[in-house]
């Protein structure tokens, strides 16, 4: 109700999230968007040396820069289709890294680290006193969520926090609602102490509960995205001018193979057709000409495919 303050502990909301994620409500912290939780985690860890797996979302490095620590990058390799090579990853990790940041599925590559590999990463990091932040903003779009999500690993490992939001899958960025999951009670308490009270308004808390119980929306959205994503991925694979990478999020990364054709050329052509795609030239560590586009409704997707076929 709007005339009264929200429950300061968000008890009912955490219970609903716990049921949705199959996790104890005691392991959950809610935030004013996943961005608040990312900022809070980074500021509280005070990492001396953070490792970010890229190319990825630029906000991580911006927040890390505010803490004054050193930032290093491990870049996914195009010749491996942006899939993480665990052996090379572990071998290249500096001994003094104390915070690892992953986006899974990753933005902008749409690649993903499977749960079994994530367990190896968490084991390695646990042995080397490295805390791991996993941004799962796009995980609900994955063909098999259980195959990707690390939430099931938070009971086993206390050196990890998984962060999610409702901006993408639930198409509700205006709510500013995110949540984090960790079994590290000491760290969780530190986060709660440094959070502003009532950081989530009553409307967002109520909407969050309704969203996580809406099985019809969840199933319909997943069916649409999965079927259309497969259709677009296969279609682009047959276009000689492009190379598409196996997608796990609600978008596809495409490399332009045709000489003299640039990402801006395609961006401009799409704008003329009243479509918006991402020119990826601004992403660090993404060498070459790339575009990225989101999966839309079938009609818009077909419209984009017809445009790409012209090249």
Q: Model-found features: residue ranges?
A:
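PLP-dependent enzyme catalytic core of the Aspartate aminotransferase-like
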Residues: 272-275, 282-311
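N-terminal small-domain helix-loop-helix segment of the aminotransferase-like
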Residues: 1-36, 40
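PLP-dependent aminotransferase-like
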Residues: 11, 43-102
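Conserved PLP-binding catalytic core of the aspartate aminotransferase-like
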Residues: 226, 239-273
């Amino acid at each position: 109700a709007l005339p009264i303050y929200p429950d300061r502990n968000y008890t009912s909301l955490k219970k609903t999230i716990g049921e949705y994620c199959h996790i104890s409500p005691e392991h959950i912290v809610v935030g004013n968007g996943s961005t608040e939780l990312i900022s809070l985690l980074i500021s509280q860890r005070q990492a001396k040396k953070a490792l970010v797996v890229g190319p990825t979302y630029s906000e991580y490095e911006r927040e890390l820069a505010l803490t004054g620590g050193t930032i290093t990058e491990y870049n996914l390799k195009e010749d491996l289709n942006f899939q993480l090579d665990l052996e090379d990853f572990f071998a290249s990790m500096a001994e003094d890294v104390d915070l690892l940041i992953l986006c899974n599925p990753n933005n902008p590559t749409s690649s993903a680290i499977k749960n079994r590999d994530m367990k190896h990463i968490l084991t390695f990091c646990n042995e080397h006193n490295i805390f791991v932040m996993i941004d799962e903003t796009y995980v609900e779009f994955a063909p098999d969520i259980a195959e990707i999500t690390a939430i099931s690993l938070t009971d086993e490992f206390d050196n990890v926090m998984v962060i999610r939001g409702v901006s993408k899958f639930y198409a509700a960025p205006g709510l500013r609602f995110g949540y984090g999951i960790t079994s590290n009670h000491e760290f969780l308490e530190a986060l709660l102490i440094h959070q502003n009270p009532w950081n989530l308004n009553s409307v967002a808390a109520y909407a969050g509960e309704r969203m996580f119980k809406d099985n019809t929306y969840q199933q319909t959205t997943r069916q649409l995205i999965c079927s259309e994503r497969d259709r677009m991925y296969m279609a682009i694979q047959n276009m000689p001018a492009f190379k598409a990478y196996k997608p796990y999020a609600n978008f596809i990364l495409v490399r332009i193979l045709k000489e003299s054709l640039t990402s801006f050329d395609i961006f401009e052509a799409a704008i003329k057709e009243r479509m918006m795609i991402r020119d990826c030239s601004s992403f660090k560590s993404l060498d070459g000409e790339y575009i990225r586009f989101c999966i839309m409704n079938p009609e818009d997707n077909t419209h984009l495919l017809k445009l790409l076929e012209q090249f």
